[in-house]
Amino acid sequence: MTDQIHRILTRVQKPARYVGGEYNQIVKRKQDIDVRVAFCFPDTYEIGMSNIGMRILYGVMNEMPGVWCERVFAPWGDMEAEMRAHRLPLWALESHDPVRDFDLVAFTLGYEMCYSNVLNMLELSGLPLLAKDRKGLEGIVFAGGVCTVNPEPLADFIDFFSIGEGEESTREIIECYRAAKRQGLSKQEFLREAAKLEGVYVPSLYTHTYNPDGTLAAITPAPGAPARVKKRIVQDLDRAYFPTKTIVPSTQIVHDRSNLEIFRGCIRGCRFCQAGFCYRPIRAKSADTLCRQAIESLEDSGNSEITLASLSTSDYRELEALADGLLRYCEPRKINLSLPSLRADNFSRELMLRIQKVRKSGLTFAPEAGTQRLRDAINKNVTEEEILSTCATAFSGGWNSVKLYFMLGLPTETDEDVIGIAELVYKILQVWRENGSGKKRGLSINLATAYFVHKPFTPFQWAAQITPEEYLRRVHLLQANLHAKCVDYRYHESDLSRLEAVMARGDRRVGKALLEAHNLGCRLDGWDEYFDYEKWLEAFRRAGLDPDFYTTRGYGVDELLPWQTIDVGVTTNFLLREREKALRSESTPDCRTHCNGCGARRLSERGLCDESPAV
């Protein structure tokens, strides 16, 4: 297929997306391979190659003898048109072989708005969309990633899901498949064997029935299938696989830098944050391990920037020691050290001043809510005083721009909370007037608000999403209270967030709407150029579904939820306790201060989170 691919490259944007051949890509001899995996990222090359999870699992699979994992990305619209016109099937970058020729087709799901791309990539590959129509042991389709904590909207299309962290479970899945292939098992026999692995959910082994009002009545597992599927976790991150010799992209990507994962989980327990609950228990790498991995990665890639990735980087216990070690290496080489996910309540001016010697990065904070009452309700344990003090520290240190992120539509939010966002912005402006250095340049405040989506496995999973009309009313209320010229305010469009809520909170029937949307041409929904909400509304009409059933309808606390087959560690009782505290605007201390009994400890072999207080 290589010659055919090259003939159409001159007709598309960014042809480097489609050819592979990058430094450090892995190519193996086909005669040495007995399991081939097409690792599919359901978005463009630039997005997928920035994904740290994809880089990790690409390395994990290719370390296995007899296994060759190759990368596949969603084509942009111009390339898709050329592929269809020339009847070219979707191919893998390393070999240029069609995806339909692979043993396993694996998708990583990090964003619900990529679901339409999954169907489009299957169709472009020449594979049947519905799992029940794929009969043989070849072309088994499975998926992992954080979105799989509610796998049901994709249950009709995916043969099985890998729930939780994949470094160890992916190896077990491939060995299970290799054995099935050697033994000549049927697809159904293989799926039953795979279902015995911890963390594997096979949707065809579960029957969903519904009440007359549309709510779930029962989820019935087939004989031998577990009633609940427990997510997999990596117990020791210091010993876990982490790639320091990674592919160097041959075109610009979104995050063109080295990424270093410093810990998983989060001590904070913000009630809106799905990742904070789903990645528990908290586990961290040592500073020595991180320094070694960082230096090896930078020396191999030649990158001029490295990011310390986590949900809350400033909560890493050894941050000062880690930063010291990295800066000793980075400063003389003019390598920028980026610290995202900093919190206003533990911002270190000294650390930031040292980091800015190479390049001053932007200052970003996410207060999420405009008043202390609402911040307490969502358990965003940061005070207005801490926010203003942090800004004063930063402004006096030379920063003259700040990005602020908030959400609209949080449970219990009132107009007072919305206006409170504007009031906080003006207080920050006043702090600048009192503390800013280099005032000739003026202060720049970039303010963004998102339309809140209530995700599974959070204390707000039962809540109703506000209507799009109410969301826009609150947006306009905030706009009416913002007058300073230094403030650039942007807000998320409501249609996309509404559809995201359906996909995040939906049951198995949503798959029918997803299939109708695919037939109507929906794809690349995360991109403004392609998102067409009217087509989606038509898809729901054809499927006989009302999006409001999954969005503006609150779920009953006694209601059977679509994702109840999945066990992420955090218990329903804990989430209900946190929900009640939210309604009282009562905060919960972080895990480092006090163990709040979320249930995630039981997933750890040691029975403890790394951040748990001594007991």
Describe these PLM feature segments.
Residues 8-38, 45-46, 203, 209, ...:
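N-terminal [4Fe-4S]-dependent radical SAM core
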